[in-house]
C-alpha cells in the first residue's frame, strides 16, 4: 500500500499527504490509532515509505506485514510464541530492548498492545526520533488513555502523572482512522501532542474529517479539513531544514 493508493481511496487529501511526508522526514514520533479493520497497518506501511532511504530502520511485528521499500539498512524482527514446554518466547518488549543495541535511527512497531508501550515510549524519548507505531483506540484521546493503561502493565507502581509526562514528551502526532458505515476507511483526525499541563495531556487538532451534504446512510462523502489551529511544535521541522508551514 502506498500513499498514492490512500489518495485514490479518499482516505487522505494531497495536502495531508504532503504534511505527513514533512512530519515523517522531520522525524516526528507518530502514533496511528483506530478500531479493528480501520487500516492502521496499511496506513503505517504507506507513510513508512516517506522514511529517507539512507536511514537504519528496525521493524518489530508479531507477523511480517510491513513492506517498506527502498530502505537499504532495514532490519525486520518478529516475535515468537513459546514452545510446547512454555520456553523460547520472544516478546515485543524483548525485541524493542534488543533493537536499541542495534543502533537504529528509527524503530517501527507494528502494534503496541501491552507493557511494550513503556519501552517504545522510552526509546522515543532517548534519541530514536521518527519512530512509528499503531494501537487500538476509538479516538485520539482514547489512544492516550490506552497508552496509560499499557504503560502501567509494563511499569507497575509508576505514578500516573509520570506516565502522562512520558507520553506527552514522547509522542508528537496521533492519527485516528475509522471504518465508516459504508465500509470505507477514512482518516478522521490528525492531532498534535502539545505537552502535559494541569494534569492532562494537551492535544491540538490539526485536521478533522467533515462529512458534506452528499453523505447518505449508504455512502459517506467528505474529506479531511484543516481546523484552523496553528501547528505549534515546529522545532523538528525547522531542525530538518524545512521552512514550510504546516
Named regions from a protein language model:
Residues 1-26:
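P-loop NTP-binding catalytic core
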Residues 49-58:
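Post-Walker A helix-loop "phosphate-sensing" segment adjacent to the P-loop in P-loop NTPases
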Amino acid at each position: 500500500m502506498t500513499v498514492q493508493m490512500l489518495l485514490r481511496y479518499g482516505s487522505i487529501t494531497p495536502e495531508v499527504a504532503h504534511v505527513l511526508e514533512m512530519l515523517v522526514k522531520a522525524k516526528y514520533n507518530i502514533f496511528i490509532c483506530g478500531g479493528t479493520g480501520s487500516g492502521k497497518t496499511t496506513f503505517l506501511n504507506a507513510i513508512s515509505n516517506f522514511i529517507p532511504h539512507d536511514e537504519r530502520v528496525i521493524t518489530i511485528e508479531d507477523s511480517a506485514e510491513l513492506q517498506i521499500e527502498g530502505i537499504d539498512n532495514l532490519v525486520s524482527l518478529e516475535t515468537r510464541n513459546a514452545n510446547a514446554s512454555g520456553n523460547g518466547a520472544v516478546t515485543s518488549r524483548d525485541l524493542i530492548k534488543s533493537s536499541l543495541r542495534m543502533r537504529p535511527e528509527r524503530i517501527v512497531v507494528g502494534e503496541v498492545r501491552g507493557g511494550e508501550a513503556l519501552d517504545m515510549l522510552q526509546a522515543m524519548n532517548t534519541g530514536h526520533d521518527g519512530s512509528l507505531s499503531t494501537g487500538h483506540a476509538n479516538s485520539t484521546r482514547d489512544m492516550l488513555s490506552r497508552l496509560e493503561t499499557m504503560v502501567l502493565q509494563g511499569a507497575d507502581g509508576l505514578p500516573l502523572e509520570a506516565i502522562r509526562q512520558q507520553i506527552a514528551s514522547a509522542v508528537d502526532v496521533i492519527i485516528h482512522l475509522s471504518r465508516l458505515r459504508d465500509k470505507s476507511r477514512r482518516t478522521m483526525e490528525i492531532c498534535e501532542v502539545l505537552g502535559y499541563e494541569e494534569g492532562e495531556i494537551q492535544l491540538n487538532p490539526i485536521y478533522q474529517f467533515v462529512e458534506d451534504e452528499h453523505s447518505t446512510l449508504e455512502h459517506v462523502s467528505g474529506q479531511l479539513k484543516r481546523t484552523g489551529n496553528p501547528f505549534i511544535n515546529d522545532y523538528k521541522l525547522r531542525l530538518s531544514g524545512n521552512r514550510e508551514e504546516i
